[in-house]
Amino acid sequence: MVRTAVLILLLVRFSEPAEHCNAQMNSGPWRIKNLSIAPPKETLQKDVEIEIVETNMDENVIIGYKGYYQAYAYNGGSLDPNTRIEETMETLNVAKEDLLMWSIRRQCEVGEELIDQWGSDSDNCFRNKDGRGVWVFGKELVKRQNNNHFARHTCNRSWRCGVSTAKMYTRLECDNDNDECKVTILDINGASINVTENTVLHRDGVSMVLKQKSTFSRRPEKVACLLIKDDKSDPRSVTREHCLVDNDIFDLSKNTWLCKFNRCIKRKSENVVKQRPPTWRHDVSAKHDEGASATKGDLMHIQEELMYENDLLRMNLELMHAHINKLNNMLHNLIVSVAKVDERLIGNLMNNSVSSTFLSDDTFLLMPCTHPPPHTSNCYNNSIYKEGRWVANTDSSQCIDFNNYKELAIDDDIEFWIPTIGNTTYHENWKDASGWSFIAQQKSNLISTMENTKFGGHTTSLSDITDMAKGELNAKLWSFMLGHAFSFMLTVGVIIFLFCMVRNRSRAY
């Protein structure tokens, strides 16, 4: 009896499976904890309607200048208190009609040069001060001063002029209330100046007028905008709204005109824009001074920000790579688990017709299998595809033709907005405009010529070289010649007298 009981126990023991699960020691119930998925702060909106107003980056400006230097002198001798030289340096305003004519002829009009006009001719210093009658391609004055006519007045006058059609940068400005826009011209410091096609502006020693009226164009356009929300609790709160316009990035968060140089952009924002948080980096509006030159420190700061962004991106990529690998390992475990039920799963994933047979928990064999050619029915020869397997079939009424199948979408494809660096439009410094270079050059020419004074009148190159007035030079030359002539005559007379004395004495003996 005892032997029988032991035999039964042994049979039960060896008939049990290799793995045993005890149902009486269960725990739970359990539920798999899903990770929370936070919605992104960024939202991409397509077909956002905006209005773009645009004008030319620069405009043609006619720049002209005209002026004269005059020296009116009187020579009454060193004892006369009226002996003096009255200098006048005058810059004349050029009228619009003159500027237009100068631009057409590519010449400027001045008055006649007055050189060493003395006596009654010196009255010319009081005539034709408006500079008419002489056309030149450009002229710089000569500073002449001479006062060598005793008891006479002397007049010297020299003219200067120039004309150029040059470029000056523009700025487009639009009013937020009535949406009216205007184009202004910028000076060397980037400030607006009042120069139009109808009004001549006189400044910095020149006169300037627009060659033609500035125009601008309006056009609607649909663009893509990226909305960034820093406040997750308020879905309609938008901190920034970056829109891609002509391959350039603009922040159109506010319902106002955003003007950059020669372009203004505006859209009607449907969201409520909150005050930006007072933190550094992209959450703070950029501080910039248009037209100001960047320093080496500014560029190094930008480089530092780029390095930070690059390191941050690298860290996020490494974290994402590790997480993807973790998901892949979890997927491998899931495939192994399901493949123990579906022996064709591994082969289907490899796109190969094989069947798997597991030897242990993670070790298996692969066996080749036959696979029917492509078909449009669930029947093939004497087989039917049923519940994931090809089985024998004798009932042809179960065959279905699925050549005209329909696709059923169970999820939506995610469309990514690929990051790109904006094609930023860079602007040259305001003072680099050719118009201001022309003005600076004419000022430099005037300074150079005023440092060189001509003291003579007509044909007085020697007086210019010796830096003497014509009268002084003549006096010195005459005194030099007369003195040497007197010495020569005196010497010759003495020699003749001595010769005669010697000759008379020889006759007496």
UniProtKB/Swiss-Prot annotation:
Keywords linked to the UniProt accession: Fusion of virus membrane with host endosomal membrane, Fusion of virus membrane with host membrane, Glycoprotein, Host cell membrane, Host membrane, Lipoprotein, Membrane, Palmitate, Phosphoprotein, Signal, Transmembrane, Transmembrane helix, Viral envelope protein, Viral penetration into host cytoplasm, Virion, Virus entry into host cell
Highest taxon of the lineage: Viruses
A GO cellular component entry from the record: virion membrane
Post-translational modification (record): Palmitoylated.
Alphabetized InterPro entries for the sequence: Baculovirus_Gp64
Signal peptide: 1-17
GO BP term (any one): symbiont-mediated perturbation of host process
Entry annotated with the keyword Lipoprotein: yes
Source species of the chain: Choristoneura fumiferana nuclear polyhedrosis virus (CfMNPV)
Designated name of the protein: Major envelope glycoprotein
Main location: virion
Residues glycosylated per entry: 34, 156, 194, 351, 381, 423, 504
One family name in Pfam for this protein: Baculo_gp64
Subcellular location: Virion membrane; Host cell membrane
Lipid-modified sites (O-palmitoyl serine): 479
TM ranges: 480-502
Keyword Ribonucleoprotein: no
Role noted for this protein: Envelope phosphoglycoprotein which mediates the fusion of viral and host endosomal membranes leading to virus entry into the host cell.
Family: Belongs to the baculoviridae gp64 family.
Membrane topology classification: Single-pass membrane protein
